[in-house]
UniProtKB/Swiss-Prot annotation:
Key words, A-Z: Cell membrane, Disulfide bond, Extracellular matrix, Glycoprotein, Membrane, Phosphoprotein, Proteoglycan, Receptor, Secreted, Signal, Transmembrane, Transmembrane helix
Ranges of residues in domain ZP: 456-730
Protein encoded by which gene: Tgfbr3
Main localisation: membrane
InterPro entries for the chain: ZP-C (IPR055355), ZP-C_dom (IPR042235), ZP-N (IPR055356), ZP_chr (IPR048290), ZP_dom (IPR001507), ZP_dom_CS (IPR017977)
Membrane-spanning ranges: 790-811
Protein name in UniProt: Transforming growth factor beta receptor type 3
Disulfide topology: 55-200, 640-706, 661-730, 711-723
Length: 853
């Protein structure tokens, strides 16, 4: 029996490991969105090019050398975040193929910098002089460029006008002058153009494609990393809502996807699949550096690749029009088309650049254990017994209400990010979304805190255990642990520090990730104990006092900055919602029903049944409505567009309304009254508008797609965006509202039959009529239309009346004259001829009848 028991233990461990690997749904389908952080493989950014001021001239045309001045200004970053390297890209202007003229560069900066030069089409053997500020250096590209290039340090004037006059006095004239904030990349095109003015006069609104600085701003996004075994093939899905926050932008935008290794040293070899989706008209530009292997890019938009030097991978592209939107549909589409396993999904509301950083295969194999849920990893490590087997003291946290999104920003004093990480924005574009780690795996190393932890949660509480050895061996002995609420302090057993939080207390926040899933967030705060506490960790299960100051900033910053906060570790836990957790409301639209109808006239009386027929330059009248019980609940028409496709995910250029703002000049809104139902607390809100149809598609069947979204008339709502008018939406709508509207939208589609305009309209069948039109007889002569016939009949009537009147006038005047001339009834035969002549003469000349008589 002893032998049997001895062999049963590894068998049980193997079975438990198998259960861990196979329990639950397939890894490829378990994607619950959460705000991404720096550890996410895909980062969303907004790239912009701008300068502060500057000028350009052709004043150096007759001089032996060009003179280009760069006057850099400090950024708003703190002293510890100052940039120390700038890459200066030099290439000729468009009218010059290869630049041969000597150049002088004045590179003035408020701090010492390392200038990295990257040149294109600049002839070798040409003298070039670089004047830099004190302490700065210039690193030249490899080759013969450095043989004729010199660097000198100078003490420059700081003001623009003083520096410009100094350069003009020194060299006679200036080719270009550019003032800009320090940037990682500066692009200068050298050369002289005759269209430039003769002198350089600095202007604030200096806009030129020849002199630009590149700035990258991180953008908030949501995503997930799906757990899977390390594999040389990776599938990454990126969904972009809009490339620009400007609602009036209608130009095609280049979206750059930059692919590089996550670490510089090891070589990365991957077979990569990118599935890219954006409803807007964009051009995806793919660039890869220092990554070998094959890359396949799939998108419904146009796809391009970088230059030869920007294509380290073998790239192929495939344009597919059937790629859907939303996370669930995209994941299903990828699996149905054989693109598996899906590695990550990323959704960004606004961005024009994405950075994809790939891990080395060997490093991924070392972290293979991380694919197992964190709360169960301890079972695979026999050296560390389960920390949660020991009894815990009941939590002392005082619930604070458990408010849903947004949760307050976590101060990160002393946060030290690696140089390879993207700096976090001070105020994210989406205030309600913080850049947090992926919810599937707690961030073990973040903000300089290197500790091992595991998270376990149920439908009542969340428990996080921190390994004591890893905590103390990394130099945190004497520090203490709390949750966001400083009153929720850690307990300690023999091997772990344990922190426990109810789902609606200790600063825990939550948000809905899927219809039946909720993600809960909190943070471990590592800080120095208050002066009244003893140093070192107590033995047994003694509470760890957090001190008086739970967060930095409460005391003197100069004294407490090194010790008051060693760091913050963000952790989270996902739950399938079996019942409503405390303080969590149900679906916002559970009691709201949308509807959309099309009408023939602006009276909006009877909706058109079936397919709505429309001709060129005819109005389409649209009514959308919502039936709801909450009087503070409103709705908005987020987007309406016409498309030849029935799938609303396939965007077209015929946009009528975009983000509540009318895009078509013919859009007209109509007022409507709110209708109250006899049912208690039920009412219908309606919105009506019309637009003039223009036939831009060569097809007889079109589809009107409208996305409706819920909004709140009550200020301060955390669940829904504030209701705005179309006029306000055109000027004040930001990415925050767009992000929130996407979570509560409903799409309606109505078919439209395009009919041709003909002269014989009474013979053209129309679906607008409520009664069916019988087919015409087989042999019918199509004559004039009704209006023409009525016009002719009326004209004939008028002509007949005029003729009758004229005849009556003639008859009335000639009849009286004849009656006044009495002729004998039986004249003598001798007088007959004379009388007849007299009468004939009288009738022929009525004016002379009186004299004759």
């Amino acid at each position: 029996m002893a032998v049997t028991s001895h062999h049963m233990i590894p068998v049980m461990v193997v079975l438990m490991s198998a259960c861990l690997a196979t329990a639950g749904p397939e890894p490829s389908t378990r994607c619950e969105l959460s705000p991404i952080n720096a550890s996410h493989p895909v980062q969303a950014l907004m790239e912009s090019f701008t300068v502060l001021s500057g000028c350009a001239s052709r004043g150096t045309t007759g001089l032996p050398r060009e003179v280009h001045v760069l006057n850099l200004r400090s950024t708003d970053q703190g002293p510890g975040q100052r940039q120390r390297e700038v890459t200066l890209h030099l290439n000729p202007i468009a009218s010059v193929h290869t630049h041969h003229k000597p150049i002088v560069f004045l590179l003035n900066s408020p701090q010492p910098l390392v200038w990295h030069l990257k040149t294109e089409r600049l002839a070798a053997g040409v003298p070039r002089l670089f004047l830099v500020s004190e302490g700065s250096v210039v690193q030249f590209p490899s080759g013969n460029f450095s043989l004729t290039a010199e660097t000198e340090e100078r003490n420059f004037p700081q003001e623009n006008e003083h520096l410009l006059r100094w350069a003009q006095k020194e060299y006679g004239a200036v080719t270009s002058f550019t003032e800009l904030k320090i940037a990682r990349n500066i692009y200068i095109k050298v050369g002289e153009d005759q269209v430039f003015p003769p002198t350089c006069n600095i202007g604030k609104n200096f806009l030129s494609l020849n002199y630009l600085a590149e700035y990258l701003q991180p953008k908030a996004a949501e995503g997930c990393v799906l757990p899977s075994q390390p594999h040389e093939k990776e599938v990454h899905i990126i969904e972009l809502i809009t490339p620009s926050s400007n609602p009036y932008s209608a130009f095609q935008v280049d979206i750059i996807v930059d692919i590089r290794p996550a670490q510089e040293d090891p070589e990365v070899v991957k077979n990569l699949v990118l599935i890219l989706k954006c409803k807007k008209s964009v051009n995806w530009v793919i660039k890869s550096f220092d990554v070998k292997g094959n890359l396949k890019v799939i998108a419904p938009n146009s796809i391009g690749f970088g230059k030869e030097s920007e294509r380290s991978m073998t790239m192929t592209k495939l344009v597919r029009d059937d790629i859907p939107s939303t996370q669930e549909n995209l994941m299903k589409w990828a699996l149905d088309n054989g693109y598996r396993p899906v590695t990550s999904y990323t959704m960004a509301p606004v961005a024009n650049r994405f950075h994809l950083r790939l891990e080395n295969n060997e490093e991924m194999r070392d972290e293979e254990v991380h694919t197992i849920p964190p709360e169960l990893r301890i079972l695979l490590d026999p050296d560390h017994p389960p920390a949660l087997d020991n009894p815990l003291f009941p939590g002392e946290g005082s619930p604070n209400g458990g408010l849903p999104f947004p949760f307050p920003d976590i101060p990160r004093r002393g946060w030290k990010e690696g140089e390879d990480r993207i700096p976090r924005p001070k105020q994210p574009i989406v205030p309600s979304v913080q850049l947090l780690p992926d919810h599937r795996e707690p961030e073990e190393v973040q903000g300089g805190v290197d500790i091992a932890l595991s998270v376990k949660c149920d439908h009542e509480k969340m428990v996080v255990a921190v390994d004591k050895d890893s905590f103390q061996t990394n130099g945190y002995s004497g520090m203490e642990l709390t949750l966001l609420d400083p009153s929720c302090k850690a307990k300690m057993n023999g091997t772990h520090f344990v922190l426990e939080s109810p789902l609606n207390g200790c600063g825990t926040r939550h948000r809905r990730s899927t219809p039946d899933g909720v993600v809960y967030y909190n943070s471990i705060v590592v800080q120095a104990p208050s002066p009244g506490d003893s140093s070192g960790w107590p033995d047994g299960y003694e509470d760890l006092e957090s001190g008086d100051n739970g967060f930095p900033g409460d005391g003197d910053e100069g004294e407490t900055a090194p010790l008051s906060r060693a760091g913050v570790v963000v952790f989270n836990c996902s739950l399938r919602q079996l019942r409503n957790p405390s303080g969590f409301q149900g679906q916002l639209d559970g009691n709201a029903t949308f509807n959309m109808e099309l009408y023939n006239t602006d009276l909006f009386l009877v909706p058109s049944p079936g397919v709505f027929s429309v001709a060129e330059n005819e109005h389409v009248y649209v009514e959308v409505s919502v039936t709801k019980a909450d009087q503070d609940l409103g709705f908005a028409i987020q987007t309406c567009f016409l498309s030849p496709y029935s799938n609303p995910d396939r965007m077209s250029d015929y946009t009528i309304i975009e983000n509540i703002c009318p895009k078509d000049d013919s859009v007209k809104f109509y007022s409507s009254k709110r209708v109250h139902f006899p049912i208690p607390h039920a009412e219908v809100d309606k919105k009506r508008f019309s637009f003039l149809f223009k036939s831009v598609f060569n097809t007889s069947l079109l589809f009107l797609h409208c996305e409706l979204t819920l909004c709140s008339r009550k200020k301060g709502s955390l669940k829904l965006p504030r209701c705005v008018t179309p006029d306000d939406a055109c000027t004040s709508l930001d990415a925050t509202m767009i992000w929130t509207m996407m979570q509560n939208k409903k799409t309606f589609t109505k078919p439209l039959a395009v009919v041709l305009q003909v002269d014989y309209k009474e013979n053209v069948p129309s679906t607008k009529d409520s009664s069916p039109i019988p087919p015409p007889p087989p042999q019918i002569f199509h004559g004039l239309d009704t209006l023409t016939v009525m016009g002719i009949a009326f004209a004939a009537f008028v002509i007949g009346a005029l003729l009758t009147g004229a005849l009556w006038y003639i008859y009335s005047h000639t009849g009286e004259t004849a009656r006044r001339q009495q002729v004998p009834t039986s004249p003598p035969a001798s007088e007959n001829s004379s009388a007849a002549h007299s009468i004939g003469s009288t009738q022929s000349t009525p004016c002379s009848s009186s004299s004759t008589a």
